[in-house]
Structure formats: C-alpha cells, structure tokens
Design a protein with these regions (language model features):
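Membrane transport/envelope proteins' first extracytoplasmic loop
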Residues: 2-231
Length: 231
C-alpha cells in the first residue's frame, strides 16, 4: 500500500511540477515579505524609541489662557514634573505659507538637528527640515520673518511635530504651506513685541514625568489595588 501511495505521489509531482514550483515560489516570497516587514517595523520602533529618549519626548502637554506664575511652575516641578514652555507665534510669509515660531527648547521636545547648529544670535534661525526642503532653504540661506532677515544656521525636527500638522484635525501634512522655526529667546520676544503675528501667542506647556513621580504613582497603585479588589 505504501509503495502504491509513493508511486502515485511521485507521479502527481511529475505531472504538476510547474504548479508545485509556483506554489513553493509564492510561499518563499510571502515568508520573505513577512520577515522583511517585521524587521523593518522593529527597526523603526527601536529607532523612534531611541530618538524619543535622546531628545526628551514629552509625556503630554496642556494649554492655558494665561502663562503659569513662577509659584505654580515651582509647585508642579516639586511634584516630579519637568516643564517646558512651548509657546508659539504664527507668521504669514510672502509666498503665502505659514511659519510657526518657537523659542529654542532646553529640557523637553529638544531639537534634533540634521545639519548645522542651534540659533545663538537674534538674527539666526533653525528651520524644520521638510519646510526647508520645500522652500529650498539650506545652511546659510536667508529667510524673512515679520520684515526681519534671519540666517538659517540649522535644519532639523522636533519629536512633538514628528508629523508636521498645523492643526490636530488636519488629515495631511503640507510642508509647502506650513512649517516650524526656532529662534533665540531675544528674537522671539522681539517678534512678540511687534504684535504682527496672525493670532495671539499660544500658551502651551510640554511636560515629562520624572522618576520621583512614577515611584509615587506606583506606590499609590499598589496600596490602593488590594482595596479595589474587594470594592
């Protein structure tokens, strides 16, 4: 019986060899694609996590109508929170695009430079890389913001604008019409004092939860958890 089955199987393979070869080829290609996609996804996830850690990606942000007082900021930092002012002003450029101006970041959502350096003088600026590409801006290029000329000293990105949407409700990124720029504190204050921005300054704070905060959270969780079980 086994001999008959072997002969039949062998005959079937010979008669349909092209079909089985095609099937084997498809299986191999499918396995290759799956392994490639998994490997690529793992690389992207790992790379994103490393960049987030390196450039201090925020744990969250909140917006207020008026800036926090020094006392309020101190109270938050004492609870184990690192705060960063990510206030911004929007300006309309001559080509019709909108440029969102921030101060240089220091502690949270730090600038990831692809080229050049941070702005150190009031006449210098770092431009978001996609906007720079769409507007042919390079290191050493000049850009006019609110009538003043700025020299591009850096090109890069920030983790909170990984996809550079103007609004959270936007469905697509249009770097030809919207971009980011980072200037010194003095340059930012001058732009604010001129009062020529499209709208009033937006007061947004980015924050990171420190180890102290996490320890407090988990200690509270393990104290409360046994009681919740019997609630």
């Amino acid at each position: 019986m086994e001999k008959v089955l072997r002969k039949r199987a062998w005959r079937d393979l010979k008669e349909n060899k092209f079909r089985y070869l095609a099937l084997a080829f498809l299986i191999i290609i499918s396995m290759y694609l799956v392994i490639s996609l998994v490997g690529a996804a793992d690389t992207i996830i790992d790379g994103t996590a490393k960049q987030a850690k390196k450039h201090k990606l925020e744990d969250g942000q909140f917006q207020v109508f008026v800036p926090l007082t020094t006392k309020q900021k101190e109270n938050l930092t004492k609870k184990g929170i690192t705060l960063e002012e990510t206030f911004y002003l929007d300006f309309r450029q001559k080509d019709g695009s909108k440029l969102r101006i921030f101060k240089n970041r220091k502690k949270v959502d730090k600038i990831n430079l692809d080229q050049g350096r941070l702005a150190k003088k009031a006449s210098e600026v770092v431009v978001e890389k996609r906007y720079a590409l769409e507007h042919n801006l390079k290191i050493g290029s000049k850009i006019t913001i609110d009538g003043d000329s700025y020299k591009v000293t850096g090109i890069g990105s920030v983790p909170d604008y990984d996809a550079c949407y103007e609004k959270l409700s936007d469905s697509t990124v249009d770097s030809k019409q919207f971009g980011l720029a980072f200037v010194t504190e003095d340059a930012y204050d001058n732009l604010k004092d001129n009062e020529n921005s499209i709208q009033s300054e937006e007061y947004i704070y980015a924050y990171r939860l420190n180890v102290i905060f996490f320890n407090l959270f988990f200690n509270c969780f393990w104290l409360i958890a046994p009681f919740n079980r019997y609630a």
